[in-house]
Amino acid sequence: MIKLRLKRFGKKREASFRLVACNSTSRRDGRPLQELGFYNPRTKETRLDTEALRLRLSQGAQPTDAVRSLLEKGGLLEKTIRPAELIGKSKQEELRKSEAKTSAKNKKANEEKANEEKVEESETLEASSEA
């Protein structure tokens, strides 16, 4: 299977990446089939060979997550919601709902406690005024 991935090069702590097409079983910095672009995360510079990328994608090459995000930013791929993101979003919605319920319960409990304290204070005041 052909993968579109980032190949690291540059100095230590000054990494840049080449976007390459390579066999999925080859090493990260091994010899690629084709170089398709360049990405520098420090300067946010990106150069993509759009024709070659479209050709590789039409042939069935699978981009890695990092490459997919670069291609989405470059407009070569439509932004897709992956199943993991859907699961994360649904869990977040469930958490928000449960937090809202618990906060509502806590508010009610606090109000009831405050009302009970007021009733107890008024009873003690009445008892002290009668005595």
From Swiss-Prot:
One GO cellular component, as annotated: small ribosomal subunit
Region (Disordered): 87-131
GO MF terms held by the record: structural constituent of ribosome
UniProt keyword terms in alphabetical order: Ribonucleoprotein, Ribosomal protein
Pfam family, one: Ribosomal_S16
Segments of skewed composition (Basic and acidic residues): 87-117
Annotated GO biological process: translation
InterPro entries linked to this entry: Ribosomal_bS16, Ribosomal_bS16_CS, Ribosomal_bS16_dom_sf
Family per record: Belongs to the bacterial ribosomal protein bS16 family.
PANTHER family, per database record: 30S RIBOSOMAL PROTEIN S16, SMALL RIBOSOMAL SUBUNIT PROTEIN BS16M
Protein name: Small ribosomal subunit protein bS16
Name of the gene: rpsP
